Amino acid sequence: MSSNAQVKTPLPPAPAPKKESNFLIDFLMGGVSAAVAKTAASPIERVKLLIQNQDEMLKQGTLDRKYAGILDCFKRTATQEGVISFWRGNTANVIRYFPTQALNFAFKDKIKAMFGFKKEEGYAKWFAGNLASGGAAGALSLLFVYSLDYARTRLAADSKSSKKGGARQFNGLIDVYKKTLKSDGVAGLYRGFLPSVVGIVVYRGLYFGMYDSLKPLLLTGSLEGSFLASFLLGWVVTTGASTCSYPLDTVRRRMMMTSGQAVKYDGAFDCLRKIVAAEGVGSLFKGCGANILRGVAGAGVISMYDQLQMILFGKKFK
């Protein structure tokens, strides 16, 4: 071998892609996915909120008469406000996704370390940890994004009523914040916060409780590993959990509707008691049918969008 020959130093391996950049791509694409799903389901979401809050709207004089059902609400809203009004409040709903996901990413490891038990350590311990972690994560996220959910609710339930000459109460997202802060302060933006957190815990408890109970009974034999069977079970469990926890959603939204009003509820229990006394238990479930339809529409859109992502990018973004 010649002394003049140079020994080539092997090149260092190319640096692995940064996790931060991977997170950013997933974060942005997940945002697009959420925006598509929420925007597609916005009409049924607004109908759900109008039906759910109609008794509060009647008391406030922002609705002239009750809705006879989902179709009647669709028809009257389209006639009185135009088709584009079905997307009223959707901007706040879409914006909500980004801080929620960022917070979940930032704190999920810490919360998991605090409450993340394995099923092998005991089902009761795992189940309690799951509820605690869900409640902690939900409360933390809600603390930052609850005002957007409040604004979305107020915009969606702000109808053009003949009682007030067709005038709306709010002229957009910023106007909701300005008027609420002026009349009620910061507390007005967080009315209904406590039942929202309780609702998250109740929903998660029902979801995991039903799923773990039904899965070993139904997903057996030829159905084990079946995507369709798993999807249907997930939909049934989600629908059941959301229906059972729906009264808490009604209570929190009815509390939201009182910000800016002279008469308010003295907390979640007072709200629940007065609704049942004046309107009956059935009033707590108004809009529940539309809520179930929204779940079907959202799942369908997400499934189609996931397939599109697989074709274009070879992966799904969440």
UniProtKB/Swiss-Prot annotation:
Residues reported in the UniProt entry to bind ADP: 96, 108, 252
Outcome reported for the amino acid change (mutating residue 112 to D): Loss of transport activity. Restored transport activity
UniProt-listed InterPro entries: ADT_euk_type, Mit_carrier, Mitochondrial_sb/sol_carrier, Mt_carrier_dom_sf
Region (Important for transport activity): 252-257
Membrane-spanning parts: 23-50, 91-115, 123-143, 193-214, 228-248, 288-308
Keywords for the protein's UniProt record, in alphabetical order: Antiport, Membrane, Mitochondrion, Mitochondrion inner membrane, Repeat, Transmembrane, Transmembrane helix, Transport
Activity regulation info: The matrix-open state (m-state) is inhibited by the membrane-permeable bongkrekic acid (BKA). The cytoplasmic-open state (c-state) is inhibited by the membrane-impermeable toxic inhibitor carboxyatractyloside (CATR).
GO biological process, one term: ATP transport
Recorded topology in the membrane: Multi-pass membrane protein
PROSITE patterns: SOLCAR (PS50920)
Swiss-Prot/TrEMBL Solcar repeat ranges: 21-114, 125-217, 225-311
Motif position, Nucleotide carrier signature motif: 252-257
Keyword check for Membrane: yes
Superkingdom, natural source: Eukaryota
UniProt keyword Transport, yes or no: yes
Subunit structure: Monomer.
Domain-related comment: The transmembrane helices are not perpendicular to the plane of the membrane, but cross the membrane at an angle. At least 2 of the odd-numbered transmembrane helices exhibit a sharp kink, due to the presence of a conserved proline residue.
Chain's role: ADP:ATP antiporter that mediates import of ADP into the mitochondrial matrix for ATP synthesis, and export of ATP out to fuel the cell. Cycles between the cytoplasmic-open state (c-state) and the matrix-open state (m-state): operates by the alternating access mechanism with a single substrate-binding site intermittently exposed to either the cytosolic (c-state) or matrix (m-state) side of the inner mitochondrial membrane.
PANTHER family reported for this sequence: ADP,ATP CARRIER PROTEIN 1-RELATED-RELATED, ADP_ATP TRANSLOCASE
Protein name: ADP,ATP carrier protein 2
Species annotation: Saccharomyces cerevisiae (strain ATCC 204508 / S288c)
